[in-house]
Amino acid sequence: MAENIVKKYPWLSITTTLEKYIEPDYYDKILKNYIFNGKHDLDFLKEAAESVADAANIVEFGPGTGRATSVVIAAIKDIKSLTLVELSDRMLEKCKERFSSKKFIEYINSDTIDFILSNNKQFDFAFSLWSFSHSVHQSLKSLGLEAGKIKVREAITKLLTNSLKPGGSFFLIHFDSLSQEQSISIKQRRKDNFVFQENTQQSPSKLLIDEILAKLKNNRDIDFGCQHFIGEPIKFNSMDEALEYYLNFHMESHFNESKNIQVILEELTNDIKKFQSLDGSIKITPGCFIYNIARKN
């Protein structure tokens, strides 16, 4: 990477792998608040958790630094077991530190889809905020679209018809790939991930999840609801802040050592400028889909 680019953008020196992800403290520092209809994403989770307040056995997919985990622990008082499934060993270690007094937590260092396929436990409640799609897309990328879809269909079907106890539920927040926020990111992700080639429809993860849910509902295995939200604009004080957020959060620093980083920076800057005010501040609107899925008794 050209030295002058790193000098201009010091945060480009941050590099990670899929398994490592960015440092937990840095993640918490740059993470923005996501607000939909006046409620934070965690507020929706809190409502879902309170509706299953008697859940004893719980699993979370992709806890990150544990911000959603804390909400569920507070909402459900008599948890017997809570399984945290996290691919990033850094994030998992952060959770171990954060919840060291919670002896009912089991920590699993694994990809979500792989865990579901190998798991034999049953759960009353499962939840995942934003990260579930990462595992789906990784399966599609590593195995190819057709083989990956077979694996993902098997995993999600198993989760909803076997891993969940009868009457159990799954709460999922999935990004809206056609939102202003995600459209900018996915345009760049197409450069290294063939699963994002279509730009006029939702992500392969969203389409695949919807396909599976429709089939299981038709078979009377589950019931589910899905709400689409357009959120309050994500605010950045400067172009530098916005670029850092996109490259190190949305794009997980995977492009920071790319030989094409200068082109990527220029393209991102041009796309983000469309949302920049005269005072230099930037407002970009996010979107999401919130699923509440229940296995039938």
Go through the PLM ranges and name each one.
Residues 158-162, 167-232:
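Conserved catalytic/acceptor-binding region of the Class I
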Residues 124-151:
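A short SAM/SAH-binding and catalytic strip from SAM-dependent methyltransferases
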Residues 1-53:
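Conserved class I S-adenosyl-L-methionine
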Residues 228-278:
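C-terminal helical/coil "lid" or tail adjacent to the Rossmann-like core of SAM-dependent
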Residues 59-115:
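Class I SAM-dependent methyltransferase SAM/SAH-binding core
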Residues 55, 122-123:
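Local beta-strand N-terminus motif with an aromatic residue
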Residues 286-297:
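Core SAM-dependent methyltransferase catalytic element
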Residues 144-166:
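A short glycine-rich, Lys/Arg-flanked "PGG" loop and its adjoining helix->strand segment in the class I
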